Amino acid sequence: MSSVLKADVLVVGGGTGGTAAAIQAARCGAKTILVSEFTWLGGMLTSAGVSAPDGNELAAFQTGLWGAFLQELQERQPEGLDWGWVSFFTYDPRIGAAIFADWVKCLPNLHWISGHKPQAVIKEADRILGVQFTDFTVLAGITLDATELGDLLALGEVSHRWGWEFQAEFGEASAPIAPNDLTQTYPVQAPTWVAIMQDFGEGAVAPEIPAPPIHNPDRFTDAWDNYTPEQFLNYGRLPGGLLMINWPIRGNDYGKKVDRLIGSETSQQEFLQESLWHSQSFTHFIQTQLGRRYGLAENIFPTSHTKNPAFALHPYYRESRRLQGITTIREQDILPITGGRVAKLPINAEGICEAVAIGNYANDHHYPSGDISLQPKSIRWGGRWTGTAFTIPYGALIPASTDGLLVCEKNISVSHIANGATRLQPTVMNIGQAAGMAAALCIERGCQPRELPVRVLQEALLQDSQASAKVIPLFNLTPDRSHWLKQQRYYCDRPSSYPASGNCPLSVDRSILVGKRQCRVPTLDRGKRQCRVPTLDRAQSSFSGIFHRRGEQDYALTLTEPLSIAHRTWKLVTLDPETDELLINYEAEKPLTVWARPNFSGVWLLVFRVELKESGFLQKS
């Protein structure tokens, strides 16, 4: 007879959202059980191998558990996070997994059980009471579906969606009018089985990567045709010569008969095996084309599921079953206000702002046959492209007609089109934190999730003692500012006053900023690199030269110091709003000194402090 465990909160799934939810619920005092399929926690950030997260990269958006995770990464990876060009934060996935494991160990009221998948949902009328696993059952006051594919939604017969919606349903401009070849071939976005390769160095001969049983190298022809081989490899470069292989252009995305993921166990395993072979085939192709100095990395992932430590424990899933919730996030809910940089705040029928998490990723869809045309939601900020900001409403986490359940992964109530922006790791981590906080509050107050006042949840997130989380996106307000909490509360209570610019009114004394502002992110030495780069003292963080303005929010610096790379021109980018403001208002072709970290893959300087003379500012009429 299987044992019965009881908890206040049960989290099923140890991915990005589930791990955050379990940690947050336990930190709030709820007796929490976390059941995961895999031996690593973190999902997309770790066990799926995508250790180069996208979105919420701006300093103002690095809050909550996402911000805490970045701080831990900076401390535990002393070589720095500036390795690849696809992300500002590239790290060894083993470090990410260790962070989550350590956080869980610190919580005596959080019981983590790994190696189990849900088998059945225990339900009474329209209320979820718990979940049955192979060897045990967990009964809980609140259950959270944090599985990668929304398994509890199917097992519990909770209303959900899978696949495309057409224009008539939500009025989304980017949705197709009717079924077509793309919607029928790829009902959801293609997953990717990430691999980690190793650059063993000039003259080295790595072990040969065997071709898998299913191998067709023609699928990868021209995969990096618009890039140099070095640019291709540097896309997901990690420390220690590691290379994350998650390439979207004729690479290792795999979507053939992707419906098998929600079919029988046999059909699901068939898809997973083919996806793994497809990724192995791509790494074989890379080695064949670029040489034997590149091979599969050793001892990265546990081998419980793939038998090869270079391949992630499971695919990077971009889409899941999606809840039919109280609120559904549509494309128009993530797009910026006309002429603005942010989406409207979600306001319910009672006029209450429902925002509980933030995101800013530009909508991005992956289909092996090519991309679709999507409404633009990108802006220039900090010398580069980023996404316009949006929020996740609390109602998207709550089933329309089922109690005792919250969702906190890619299974939230969102359209297929809008999922392309809400699915990213930092946003899902924010969603998980909000769901975990909501679950703990429901236990404390003896209520169902739909009965919890959203303003109570917002306040708890804003005032969390260990990882306070922003719920209103404000580009120019970082968490270290004294009036951060006041401004967050102001727009929660007065959502109609939320500025289309995403900037709240600030009074900034420029004299404090010029040459005196301290770095928000620690200066870290990068150590030795294994790609071809100029000689540069890694301890050197000061760069001087002539400032160039090449267009709107497009900056460069032709260096005069350090001498080892003098006369070279580097892009200037920043994640800091005060530095962004200084660069906007600095005159072109004037001398400029910045404190920055170099990214050799992207050929940019990530600026965290500016020293300049008042004469360098543009004069405003």
Each PLM stretch: what is its role?
Residues V521, G527, V533-P534, A539:
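Short, low-complexity intrinsically disordered segments enriched in A/P/G/S/L with frequent Arg
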